């Protein structure tokens, strides 16, 4: 699977006038993600790119950004990656590189109630710089 990203622009004309000003002042740009099927077979004309946005499957890795391990040294589950250069720009977010999400492969899928503040080794969110994208591969 890969992701198609679009900017959502809600129609506020149907919202009562007394609320429109508050909604307009507090509006933030967001990106809507829509899953679309794409073959991952090598050589397929419409095959997914290793650095493309995806949910599940194989993660893109490099020598400097190998597959992450949990606090016990076990491989983590790859959830998703977003190619930021192909996203519409959002204020305060990087515009290039590969944003990846991983969780621990355990009974609670990385959730540790006593360590919710982070730093537990049960999940990883990382940004692979654009300069690394030309020298990587899909994890095996």
Language model regions located:
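An N-terminus-focused feature that recognizes amino-terminal "leader" regions
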Residues: 5-98
């Amino acid at each position: 699977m890969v992701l198609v990203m679009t900017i959502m622009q809600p129609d506020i004309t149907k919202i009562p006038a007394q609320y429109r000003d508050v909604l307009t002042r507090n509006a933030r740009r967001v990106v809507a993600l829509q899953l679309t099927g794409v073959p991952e077979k090598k050589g397929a004309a419409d095959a997914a790119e290793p650095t493309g946005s995806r949910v599940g499957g194989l993660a893109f890795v490099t020598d400097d950004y190998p597959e992450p391990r949990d606090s016990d040294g076990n491989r983590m589950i790859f959830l998703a990656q977003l190619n930021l250069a192909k996203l519409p720009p959002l204020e305060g977010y990087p515009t290039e590189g590969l944003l990846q999400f991983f969780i621990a492969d355990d009974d609670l899928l990385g959730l540790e109630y006593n360590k919710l503040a982070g730093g537990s080794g049960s999940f990883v969110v990382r940004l692979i710089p654009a300069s690394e994208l030309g020298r990587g591969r899909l994890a095996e």
